[in-house]
């Protein structure tokens, strides 16, 4: 469902998500593979940014948030367009998470990040330039890094 929101976009994907690469290909979404995912999130961000460096903004998301709603992604992009801030993120009770949008003016700072770190440092550095989308359900922020997240008791 989230991929449908991204039609017309380009993606950088860690190589372990073959099913996402396949689905993106079926939907004609260009995919750029991170050949060294062990180098961390920053390399995936940089590969993605290099492929879209002439765009006005870039949305970063992760593929392990099974409760993230497509409507939330759409609302976030609309918020970014309407608020005219340099960044936009989703938030629940003060906790910021993915997806996040960064305007082109932050691309250089994003390219300087190293290791297994994302753009949170930049968000904290420029709080006056961030628009926040308050989400309705905290589960949208939850990562599914562990298999037990998908047990019957957790799928609500």
Give names to the regions the model predicted:
Residues 32-34, 90, 133, 144:
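Hydrophobic residues at beta-strand termini and immediately following loops
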Residues 108, 112-156:
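Conserved alpha/beta core of the MobA/IspD/sugar-nucleotide pyrophosphorylase nucleotidyltransferase superfamily
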Residues 27-39:
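Conserved donor nucleotide-binding strand/loop of the catalytic core
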Residues 1-13:
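Single conserved hydrophobic/aromatic residue that forms the stacking wall/gate
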Residues 5-6, 67, 101, 132, ...:
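Short aromatic/basic micro-patch
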Residues 7-8, 26-28, 106, 126:
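Short, structured coil segments at secondary-structure junctions
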Residues 38-104:
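Conserved beta-loop-beta/alpha segment of the NTase-like Rossmann-fold superfamily
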Residues 18-25:
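Acidic helix N-cap motif at the loop->helix transition within catalytic regions
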């Amino acid at each position: 469902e989230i991929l449908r929101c991204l039609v017309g976009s380009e993606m950088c994907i860690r190589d372990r998500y073959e099913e996402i690469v396949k689905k993106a290909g079926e939907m004609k979404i260009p995919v750029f593979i991170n050949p060294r995912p062990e180098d961390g999130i920053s390399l995936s961000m940089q590969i993605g940014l290099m492929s879209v460096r002439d765009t006005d903004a870039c949305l970063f998301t992760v593929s392990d948030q099974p409760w993230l709603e497509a409507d939330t992604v759409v609302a976030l992009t609309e918020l970014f367009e309407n608020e005219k801030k340099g960044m936009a993120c989703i938030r629940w009770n003060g906790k910021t998470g993915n997806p996040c949008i960064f305007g082109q003016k932050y691309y250089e700072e994003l390219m300087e990040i190293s290791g297994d770190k994302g753009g949170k440092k930049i968000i904290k550095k420029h709080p006056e330039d961030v628009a926040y989308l308050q989400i309705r359900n905290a589960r949208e922020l939850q990562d599914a890094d562990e298999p037990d997240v998908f047990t019957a008791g957790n799928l609500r």
